[in-house]
């Protein structure tokens, strides 16, 4: 299965498909909401 390259927007349903990590700007508390609205992007593995 191909992984999503860095910079690809990642959502709750596919955040595990990032080649690295799904990175959200505002920390863990906002994470579910941010994933919902598309604020998170794949980035280097944390």
Swiss-Prot record:
Its biological purpose: Insecticidal toxin. It inhibits insect voltage-gated sodium channels (Nav) by partially blocking the channel pore in DUM neurons from the American cockroach, not by acting as a gating modifier. The inhibition is only partially reversible after prolonged washout. In vivo, the toxin causes flaccid paralysis followed by death when injected into Heliothis virescens larvae. It also causes uncoordinated movements followed by full paralysis to sheep blowflies (Lucilia cuprina).
Domain notes: The presence of a 'disulfide through disulfide knot' structurally defines this protein as a knottin.
Family note: Belongs to the neurotoxin 16 (SFI) family.
Protein name from the UniProt record: Mu-segestritoxin-Sf1e
Keywords of this entry: Disulfide bond, Knottin, Secreted, Toxin
Organs and tissues of expression: Expressed by the venom gland.
Keyword Disulfide bond part of the UniProt annotation: yes
One GO MF term: toxin activity
Cystine pairings recorded for this chain: 3-19, 10-22, 18-42, 24-40
Record-level GO cellular component terms: extracellular region
Keyword Secreted included in the entry's annotation: yes
Compartments reported by the entry: Secreted
Superkingdom per UniProt: Eukaryota
Pfam families noted in UniProt: Toxin_28
Region (Keys region for toxin activity): 31-33
Primary location group: secreted
InterPro entries linked to this entry: Insecticidal_knottin-like_sf, Toxin_28
């Amino acid at each position: 299965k191909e992984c999503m390259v860095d910079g690809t927007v990642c959502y709750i349903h596919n955040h595990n498909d990032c080649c690295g990590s799904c990175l959200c700007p505002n920390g863990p508390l906002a994470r579910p909401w941010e994933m919902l609205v598309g604020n998170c992007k794949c980035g280097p593995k944390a």
